[in-house]
Regions:
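Generic structural signal of hydrophobic/aromatic residues within well-ordered alpha-helices
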Residues: 9-12, 46, 167
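Conserved SAM-binding loop
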Residues: 22-132, 144-147, 216-217
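Short N-terminal helix-initiation segments at or just after the protein's N-terminus
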Residues: 1-8, 33-40, 153-163
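A general structural signal for short secondary-structure junctions and capping/turn motifs
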Residues: 14-18, 49-50, 204-206
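S-adenosyl-L-methionine-dependent methyltransferase catalytic module, highlighting the catalytic core
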Residues: 101-111, 116-219
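Class I SAM-dependent methyltransferase Rossmann-like catalytic core
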Residues: 1-21
Length: 219
């Protein structure tokens, strides 16, 4: 999650009173080390303000990791029932939809977790290179496409957010990264898919990464 993305989430969450948010499920939460150590702005901008307003946050991930409150697979009916039993009023679904083969299925399962009036805070890359963790389907929707995916909801707020970060930032820290592109340039036949990804990444030397951010209410 980018710093600008975390700041946007803070503002989006602050637009609602605590009783509209609590309990809140943070889907695909990753570990406490990621939230507080590697990307501490997630904790500072999102979860500290929520706790200050007495919003109960439940961190959910399919992996057993430190800081995960509920280990659950969002494609498993039994796990979905366990999550639904928590009676969440809101969900964070951040940078998940591009990591599943069937984003429409994941969207349906997310909607099934909340009752009518439940809130979904969704972020997904809009302009960003391939990043496998563990997979990336290159799903890059705009807000309208995201609204089509989450049918049965009302779009309350959305933006395509500039992060102020680009591939230049990585290259400044590790200039040798450019050597990878130079090495691959004349040999696309070795692995054409990897060659395409390598050449495409150069676009973000000039362009910033952008994120689709949206808030939905279940009808």
């Amino acid at each position: 999650m980018f710093k600008a993305e975390a700041r946007w989430l803070r503002c989006a969450l602050e637009a609602f009173p605590p009783e509209r948010l609590s309990p809140l499920l943070n889907l695909g939460s990753s570990s406490v080390e990621v939230r507080e150590g590697i990307q501490p702005w997630i904790e500072d901008q999102v979860f500290i303000p929520l706790r200050a307003r007495n919003v109960e946050v439940v961190h959910v991930d399919m992996r057993e990791l430190p800081g995960v409150d509920v280990q659950a697979d969002l494609t498993d009916p039994a796990d979905l029932r366990r999550l639904r039993a928590l009676r969440p009023r809101a969900l964070l679904c951040c940078n998940l939809l591009e990591r599943v083969i069937e984003p429409d299925r994941l969207a349906r399962h997310c909607l099934d977790l909340v009752a009518a009036g439940g809130l979904l805070f969704v972020t997904v890359p809009f302009s960003y290179p391939y990043h496998s963790d563990p997979i990336d389907t290159m799903y890059r929707p705009n807000p309208a496409q995201l609204a089509e995916l989450l049918c049965g909801t009302r779009l309350l707020d959305s933006t395509i957010l500039g992060t102020g970060v680009s591939y230049r930032n990585a290259v400044r820290k590790r200039p040798w990264l450019l050597l990878r592109h130079l090495w691959r340039l004349p040999i696309p036949f070795v692995s054409f898919e990897k060659w395409q990804r390598s050449m495409a990444r150069l676009y973000w030397l000039a362009a910033e990464y952008r994120i689709t951010c949206a808030v939905f209410e279940k009808l």
